[in-house]
């Protein structure tokens, strides 16, 4: 099944965002952090689900908190740790209430950074111990598992490491889960399925000098959930998928596998609509 992220639209009001998708006859929606805080989000989602047959997934930062913060399930900061866990528990509660099938969260970061730095240059900070952060993440992730209904799957999305941030941290990686080796190491401690973000992986592979095709194929063996976008390999640009591109060919190689795809493509509406058209053809 193919979903479209709320982030594909510039409209940040939840009701107006969903109203636009309704006009486009798109009813499989991934809810994520581009939306503004909305007190009545449950009522709105119930309305679209029951009246119009919408299907929802939740990604990372939804429901939107009143005060923005950088969600990090591995942070050593006790205040941010509690906020991160509490927000994820709200997400899981919503999944349980609305019978949603998937909730995905970002892999942890080894530094605490501001929301204004997300997807941009991250100011250099002291990098925490990977072992310590993984231990905290394991505790939090296992806690979340206790609250999900049996038919709700939890996923962890691979982070994106740009060359700029890699060099800014003196060629040390301030993020977790930016390669398949990271996944292989993490799953020795934490049992989880990855959400494979193609755009994130493409940039990380360029930065770390890894073979993107090989990394994609390795990840795809361990997941049934892929977030789709393309870029120039240097920046996570959230561009549309084009026929004949490398990502198109890799997705085509999975056409016989029953995956869930989420489109996170920015810019003009035509961009994500073109990508949705391609995915619909691939997954007939």
Residue ranges and their predicted role:
Residues 1-90, 96, 193, 284:
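N-terminal pre-domain/capping segments
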Residues 1-2, 14-22, 82-101, 112-125, ...:
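Histidine-acidic metal/acid-base catalytic patches
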Residues 48-61, 140-147, 180-189, 248-254:
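Alpha-helix-loop-beta-strand connector modules within alpha/beta enzyme cores
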Residues 52-54, 101, 150-152, 256-259:
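A short helix->loop->beta-strand "cap" motif at the edges of active sites that frequently abuts
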Residues 74-193:
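Active-site acidic/histidine proton-transfer and metal-coordination neighborhood
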